[in-house]
Swiss-Prot record:
Pathway: Amino-acid degradation; L-histidine degradation into L-glutamate; N-formimidoyl-L-glutamate from L-histidine: step 2/3. It is an enzyme of class 4 (lyase). NCBIfam families: hutU, PRK05414.1. Its cofactor is NAD(+). NAD(+) binds at residues 52-53, 130, 176-178, 196, 201, 242-243, 263-267, 273-274, 322, 492. This is Urocanate hydratase. It is found in: Cytoplasm. One of its GO terms (molecular function) is urocanate hydratase activity. It comes from Salmonella typhi. Catalyzes the conversion of urocanate to 4-imidazolone-5-propionate. Keywords: Cytoplasm, Histidine metabolism, Lyase, NAD. It catalyses: 4-imidazolone-5-propanoate = trans-urocanate + H2O.
Length: 561
């Protein structure tokens, strides 16, 4: 690894109201960049890795320093351009333009492979931004907890008469994304057994209360699961082992979980999935000396992993891919029926996307947890009738450990995002919270991603691979005045399999911010309703009509009906 990708330095975002940059609109991206690299947030901050294999916040440390310098100097009518983690230009725009525009990991489709990307990365010409790593809005595992919780809850509704009490989920992976699974299962009322091959990750999840217990052996783990499910307790258990070994063993023993999924970093076979029989140090060494052989070894293990998942599915166990592209990797290794079990979006989440409901998140730039608790109360006040959401907020306050700057996520839709943003802006204006708040989201949202093996799998009209939609989302958020906008490739499922966009907007208490919030927090989720209405989903068409969206072709179709 080039020296510029490693630095023994601890980075934490400033707290309070003293500015390092010239305004809150440039202070916000500066703090959020730094927050992504906080050791309480990032998986490997010394190498700029935030989460998801090699998802970085900046291309190298020289680029990081240059980004920080540019943001501290940026004027109110200038825009900083970031190309794969490198600051490449500052241009005069206008006050309501984004302060930062980011493009990460984008490759011409024919060359959009891990092999070509890794060559560029080795030359210092590219950076893998994942989704929220390179777009500076990662908030730790909380960022995916509610989405995973909603998935488990819906699985309980569909398969177990609305409750997961006395049930258990089998999964793997305790990294930045997978680490949400055990807590989400617990919050949904289920026990869980999560396989993780790195003890350090288990230790972190135990320390932050995302995992309740660690078992010493597989027999110990199964004994715990049996005891807790019999007692109706929702307890999460971790086991340090390789999923490619454990899942086939469970199949051979005839063990029958109640849900099976996976959230290892299978999207990146070179850095994110330990081959069976290897130790982590051997994996890292071989990734440098023999990348092709290492990737093949990882994918062979993924094939064994997926064959076991298929066996569980054949037993009648609800089994689903949680968006890491492990089915694709297995299919490339000869598992022709790898896609016989579905992804989580078509199985459980798409009805939410049809109404523009997705991962709305916000961060208190003050660093004061009380600011988040006050906004929690405001959400309950505004979305007064949604008791399911209230329950989520109560559980989140009780169980979720803040990582870095205090943050919250809750899944809300087109009807509410603008209202909540305006309310937060008013709280800043009136001094109810001590500093501005940033509002963003995961790129995993209803209108901001094209990913045929994940968010857009099995679209009704067959438009799974059409990536015009995230491009339009990024363009519209730019035109609407988001504070920073990002357009990435390869997040979640790896090179060649996704394109996606993100946005963040600052609530600084000004009238100008309120005007931008009205545009951005309406238009952004509205693109999701538009995308699903265009694909023929009745729920989305109904939502578009209810919210008064101007969708010419949908209106024409409705008129013909």
């Amino acid at each position: 690894m080039p020296e510029s990708k490693y630095r023994q330095q601890t980075i934490r975002a400033p707290r309070g109201t003293v500015l390092t940059a010239k305004s809150w609109l440039t202070e916000a991206p500066l703090r959020m960049l730094m927050n992504n690299l906080d050791p309480d947030v990032a998986e490997n901050p010394h190498e700029l890795v935030v989460y998801g294999g090699i998802g970085r916040a900046a291309r190298n440390w020289e680029c990081y320093d240059a980004i920080v310098d540019a943001l501290t100097r940026l004027e109110a009518d200038e825009t900083l351009l970031i190309q794969s983690g490198k600051p490449v230009g500052v241009f005069k725009t206008h006050d309501n333009a984004p302060r930062v525009l980011i493009a990460n990991s984008n490759l011409v489709p024919h060359w959009a492979t891990w092999e070509h990307f890794n060559e560029l990365d080795a030359k210092g010409l590219a950076m893998y931004g994942q989704m929220t790593a390179g777009s500076w809005i990662y908030i730790g595992s909380q960022g995916i907890v509610q989405g995973t919780y909603e998935t488990f809850v819906e699985a309980g509704r569909q398969h177990y008469n609305g409750t997961l009490a006395g049930r258990w989920a089998l999964t793997a992976g305790l990294g930045g994304m997978g680490g949400a699974q055990p807590l989400a299962a617990t919050l949904a009322g289920a026990c869980s057994l999560t396989i993780e091959c790195q003890q350090s990750r288990i230790d972190f999840r135990l320390r932050t209360r995302y995992v309740d217990e660690q078992a010493a052996t597989l027999d110990d783990a199964l004994a715990r699961i049996t005891r807790y499910t019999r007692e109706g307790k929702a307890v999460s258990v971790a086991l340090c082992a390789n999923a490619a070994d454990i899942l086939p063993e469970l199949v051979n023993r005839g063990v029958r979980p109640d849900l099976v999924t996976d959230q290892t970093s299978a999207h990146d076979p070179l850095h994110g999935y330990l081959p069976s029989g290897w130790c982590w140090e051997e994996y890292q060494k071989n990734a440098q000396s023999d990348p092709r052989g290492t990737m093949q070894a990882a994918k062979r293990s993924m094939a064994a992993h997926v064959r076991a998942m298929l066996a569980f599915s054949k037993m009648g166990v609800p089994t689903f891919d949680y968006g890491n592209n492990i089915r694709q990797m297995a299919k490339e290794m000869g598992v022709e029926n790898a896609f016989d079990f579905p992804g989580f979006v078509p199985a459980y989440i798409r009805p939410l996307f049809c109404r523009g409901i997705g991962p709305f998140r916000w961060v208190a730039l003050s660093g004061d947890p009380q600011d988040i608790y006050k906004t929690d109360a405001k959400v309950k006040e505004i979305v007064a009738e949604d008791k399911h959401l209230h329950h989520w907020l109560d559980m989140a306050r009780e169980r979720i450990h803040f990582q870095g700057l205090p943050a919250r996520i809750c899944w809300v839709g087109l009807e509410w995002r603008q209202k909540l943003g305006l309310a937060f802006n008013e709280m800043v204006r009136c001094g109810e919270v001590s500093a501005p708040i940033v509002i963003g989201r995961d790129h995993l949202d209803s209108g901001s991603v094209a990913s045929p093996n994940r968010e857009t799998e099995a679209m009704r009209d067959g438009s799974d691979a059409v990536s015009d939609w995230p491009l339009l989302n990024a363009l519209l958020n730019t035109a609407s005045g988001a504070t920073w906008v990002s357009l990435h490739h390869g997040g979640g499922v790896g090179m060649g399999f996704s394109q996606h966009a993100g946005m963040v907007i600052v609530c600084d208490g000004t009238d100008e911010a309120a005007a931008r919030i009205r545009r951005v927090l309406h238009n952004d989720p509205a693109t999701g309703v538009m995308r699903h209405a265009d694909a023929g989903y009745d729920l989305a068409v109904e939502c578009a009509v209810e919210q008064g969206l101007n969708l010419p072709m949908v209106a024409a179709t409705q008129g013909k009906g």
